[in-house]
A protein has these predicted regions:
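Bacterial Sec-exported substrate-binding components of ABC uptake systems
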Residues: 1-38, 138-174, 231, 289-294
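Structured C-terminal subdomain patch of bacterial secreted/periplasmic proteins
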Residues: 125-133, 139-142, 229-294
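A local structural motif
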Residues: 23-28, 62-70, 198-208
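Short helix-initiation/N-cap motifs at beta->coil->alpha
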Residues: 17-20, 68-80, 207-216
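Proline-aspartate-enriched helix->loop->beta-strand connector
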Residues: 79-92, 111, 216-229
Length: 294
């Protein structure tokens, strides 16, 4: 998780980051680099500007960073290009090994670095809170954080009040790529966390063997009411083809009520695999519509 600010004086913000370090960040840093596109987006939503970011800031988030240095792919950013941008503050991912490996080099060079880990709306809200402390733009925390939370709370309350029976809250979450289809549990994925937050029962949480080996027999036995699929990778059509192949190769899957009755949902990658950030309420709204579909 992302620690809340512990204390701050007039010029700095002190907080515990996602890898357990106490960091002291100067307010309003002049040259900021984000090692993930989603974190670049959060920093800009907090009123900040960027001197460098990973490629997905442009490709997946469509951010306008004309003067910023493109440091390469999110999983393998170039340390050389990052340093060439002369950052005084680097926003890094605790769950990306290459980012964590850069820590010692950045610290040795006197470059402030803070690590974040965002898998849920609450994680996003905590990160935005810290970033708006650093930019001194708490108005943007209200606008891009608390206002979104109010919308999400309303959607969750509406779902809870609809008294969906337990068997209709049973879900299977699949992640499809061009070369595989895997079941995912509630933790560690955007859609998994959202389904859990809405009060759904993910069959992979109680049957962990599903996570290691996609057992068609277990899926048939559990009979999920909804099946949600998120695609990953750049080739969405190839990922969808992987899913189609799985169903063709395992005809028993076609006998599931969820498949027969239109409750197999292929979800938008932008809103349910990447981090939706300011669009999180939109994601919850779409999910609500799917979950209440008979």
């Amino acid at each position: 998780c992302n620690g809340q600010p512990k204390n701050e004086n007039k010029n700095t913000v002190v907080f515990t980051d996602a890898i357990g370090r106490e960091v002291n960040i100067k307010k309003n840093p002049e040259r900021v680099a984000a090692l993930l596109g989603s974190f670049a987006d959060v920093w800009m939503l907090a009123g900040g500007k960027l001197c460098a970011s990973a490629e997905d800031a442009w490709e997946d988030f469509g951010l306008e960073l004309d003067d910023a240095v493109n440091i390469g792919g999110a999983h393998s950013p170039s340390l050389e290009l990052l340093i060439s941008a002369d950052p005084d503050f680097v926003i890094a991912s605790a769950s990306t090994a290459s980012n964590v490996e850069m820590r010692e080099t950045l610290e040795a060079m006197g470059i402030a670095v803070a690590y974040f880990d965002v898998d849920s709306f609450d994680d996003y809200l905590k990160m935005l809170d810290i970033c708006t402390d650093i930019t001194e733009r708490k108005d943007l925390y209200e606008q891009n954080g608390l206002a979104i939370k109010a919308q999400i709370d309303e959607i969750k309350a509406e779902y809870k009040n609809s008294d969906i029976p337990e068997d209709e809250r049973k879900v299977l979450l699949l992640r499809a790529a061009s070369s595989f289809v895997k079941a995912k549990g509630s933790s560690g994925t955007i859609l998994g966390e959202m389904l859990h937050d809405m009060g759904c029962i993910n069959i992979a949480d109680s049957n962990t063997s599903l996570l290691e080996n996609l057992s068609v027999e277990a899926i048939i036995r559990e009979e999920p009411y909804h099946i949600f699929v998120v695609t990953m990778g750049s080739d969405t059509e190839a990922a969808k083809q992987s899913l189609e192949n799985l169903i063709k190769e395992n005809p028993a899957l076609s006998t599931l009520d969820a498949v027969k009755n239109g409750r197999l949902h292929v979800m938008d990658k932008t809103l349910f695999n990447l981090k939706p950030n300011v669009r999180w309420a939109e994601s919850y709204g779409i999910l609500y519509d799917k979950l209440t579909k008979k």
